[in-house]
Amino acid sequence: MSDIDEPSGADQALVDPAAPRRSGISRRALVFGGIAVGGLAALGGGALVYREIRRSAPPEGTWVKLSPIVPVPEASPRPVSPASEEPGSDTTVAVWAHADDDIIFANPHLAGIIGSGATLRTIFVTAGDAGRGLDYAKQREAGIRAAYDEMRGSTQPWNTAQLTLRSGARVTRFVPSDDPRLSITVLRLPDGNLSGKGFATTGEAGLTQLINGTVPALAPIDDGPTLDASRLAETVAELIHAGRPDHITTNIPHESAFARGDHPDHSCVGSLVRAVAPVSGIAPEAVTYYIGYPSQHEPVNVEGDALDAKVDVYATYAAQDPVVTCDGAAACLAQPGFGQWLRRSYGKTEAELRLT
């Protein structure tokens, strides 16, 4: 969930990614039970810190028309991908625009997957860099790994590998050294900004321009091979199939009425997954789409112990994100936008998308 409009005129120094992260206060068992009762207990004090920006209202994405996505048909039989993963149990492949979309919009369902012993393969399409470069993107990646550690109850190191896919894309994959049923794969494409117009530091281009054909290709911020629209679709389809999913979770697609006001990157990724999932052999009913920013307009449905645990996970991530961070549960819940989203989580099936 990248929520920065434009880089500030004088960026402050980024936090050292090697700095010790917040120690988790684990309430995982409470989340895994799937019970949400009562109010948030014993909110601790703490000051909300905006290192780069200050907001008084939740962010809202610009509505930009998006061209239809036409996936390239896969060869049959499908060649084995270098990204192919070991078969798992009740496997979910989760495809998100930014590192933290899952812990904000799809929790406590996300924690339930991890706590149940099922297999989870997560893919982040953009770097969520907000025009601030690879170092900042890597801090966000470290934050999401820390959040997963909080949910799984381990602090063992993660192994890192670079993979070149059949599509020609190069991705980075992280796998816990003690838990191979989990993985995080990142493409590191440039953040598209709330405006959908990208950032000056990355050529003012993002997923919206790529899909609409106003730029011919996007260059990952880690200097990986450039991807045009068809190669991006091939890459996402390849990664989905490589994860051997029983289920897919992702952002709400652009063509849904629930996408109005969402981050343009969220809409692009949701539409991309919706287009390529059938090519990857996934039935429409196996895909769940999570409402992003507009979830704030829905009734609160995450409360009590489930909210406590969700906020713990988010605060663990936020301790690594030097742009917007919160110190304690009260501060996280007071943060414009984040406080509303953390109290809500709405997944929609294909039949519930309200397609426009």
What is the role of each PLM region?
Residues V236, I240-H254:
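Proline-aspartate-enriched helix->loop->beta-strand connector
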Residues M1-I25, A36-A41:
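N-terminal secretory signal peptides
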Residues T249-T250, A257, V269, V273:
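Catalytic toxin/effector domains delivered as secreted proteins or via bacterial secretion systems
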Residues P58-A242, V313-V323, A330:
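Active-site rim/loop-helix segments in enzyme catalytic domains that contact anionic ligands
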